[in-house]
Design a protein with these regions (language model features):
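A conserved pocket-lining segment of Rossmann-fold NAD(P)-dependent short-chain dehydrogenase/reductase
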Residues: 203-223, 227
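Mid/C-terminal beta-alpha module of Rossmann-like enzyme folds, strongest
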Residues: 231-287
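Conserved C-terminal active-site "lid" loop/helix of NAD(P)H-dependent oxidoreductases
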Residues: 260, 280-309
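Catalytic helix-loop patch of NAD(P)-dependent Rossmann-fold dehydrogenases
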Residues: 148-188
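NAD(P)H-binding glycine-rich loop region in Rossmannoid oxidoreductase-like domains
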Residues: 30-88, 99, 107, 111-114
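Conserved Rossmann-fold NAD(P)-dependent oxidoreductase catalytic core, especially the SDR/UDP-sugar
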Residues: 86-99, 103-110, 114, 119-163
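Glycine/proline-rich active-site loop of Rossmann-fold NAD(P)-dependent oxidoreductases
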Residues: 169, 181-182, 194-207, 234-245, ...
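Amphipathic terminal alpha-helices
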Residues: 313-329
Length: 329
């Protein structure tokens, strides 16, 4: 079951469907208007809202693997949505007759999983110890706060610098506690900036939004959305309980350099560069929050433990595949 089935969730579903059409994939959605879109993608919609616990009763024990891709709510330091999800998944209540086949046809699930082809060797995607679900949580590398450009591995202590990151730390801790008490088995994937053809900063470049000068600029980290989907699925199979893994490629660029690479690939003008003091006066708070944090994520654990070979090892590898550049404006 995919919770928070947006762009990345749909990519996860597509990758699973491409390998085994009869694999039953559910998606929790709070909007009935999305049901048609989900069904067209071969996904069974389950209507429920993480902000309304009473609507989540149907998801108890409904799926052996849960991809938790939903962001926290917009306020507070505690992720109440993850609280609601953990409570629902740990509930002893049996699922309704309509949703029961996700577990009732366990033999079919295992047969489908065993016959899947690489890179998704999903033989473990239906765990033996049902009904304890495997939960793969899509967290953020923002939990580390500013690291001064240092290389960061998964053992580094978290130091969230804003409420958004503190809510992510809250979610991680809730899932680890639930794992410790045997309610579920969580894997935590910390994710940097996600890019894809539909997730590039083209509007920002066309608008001429400034970047920081080299001396003030910060290191950023990246992962292509398709590679991220692969990592999330592989974490369900090869991830270890309560274990953290970085979903990051090999790119080592500062933010302004990333924008310049994208601009060059699409025939756009490079962003103007300004000092940090000027950026504090000009730019919106959300963008500034990213400009205040610099780190370089290590991805050795991802490659070693999940046995991931990235389709796009770097941003440059992806940009070489884009269509002909637009003319300069």
């Amino acid at each position: 079951m995919i919770v928070g089935c947006g762009d990345v969730g749909m990519r996860c579903a597509a990758q699973l469907r491409a390998r085994r059409e009869n694999l039953r994939i559910l998606a929790l959605t709070s909007r009935r208007s999305r049901c048609v879109e989900l069904r067209a993608a071969g996904v069974v919609p389950v209507v429920g809202d993480l902000d309304a616990r009473a609507t989540l009763k149907r998801i108890a024990r409904v799926a052996p693997v849960v991809l938790h891709l939903a962001p926290p709510q917009a306020t507070g330091d505690v992720d109440r949505r993850t609280q609601a999800l953990v409570a629902a998944l740990a509930s002893p209540r049996r699922p309704s007759r309509q949703l029961a086949p996700a577990y009732g046809r366990l033999r079919a699930w295992r047969t489908a999983a065993r016959s899947a082809r690489p890179p998704f060797q999903t033989s473990a995607i239906v765990p033996d110890a049902l009904p304890r679900p495997v939960v793969v949580y899509a967290s953020t590398s923002g939990v580390y706060g500013d690291c001064g450009g240092a290389r960061v591995d998964e053992t580094r202590a978290v130091r969230p610098a804003n409420p958004r990151a503190r809510r992510r730390v809250s979610a991680e801790r809730q899932l680890r506690r639930a794992t410790a008490r045997g309610a579920l088995s969580a894997r935590i994937v910390r994710i940097p900036g996600i890019y894809a053809a539909n997730r590039l900063p083209l509007a920002r470049l066309e608008k001429g939004t400034p970047a920081l000068v080299e001396a003030d600029d910060v290191y950023t980290n990246h992962i292509h959305a398709d590679d991220l989907a692969s990592i999330l699925l592989r974490a369900a199979v090869r991830g270890k309980p309560a274990r953290v893994v970085h979903a990051s490629d090999d790119t080592e660029l500062k933010m302004g350099d990333y924008f310049e690479r994208v601009a060059r690939a699409f025939g756009l003008r490079s962003p103007p560069r300004i000092a940090r003091a000027e950026a504090e006066r000009q730019l919106e708070p959300m963008l500034l929050s990213f400009m205040r944090e610099s780190r370089r994520l290590a991805n050795a654990r991802m490659k070693r433990e999940l046995r991931i070979a990235l389709r796009y090892p770097s941003v440059d590898d992806f940009l070489r595949t884009v269509s002909a550049p637009r003319p300069l404006k």
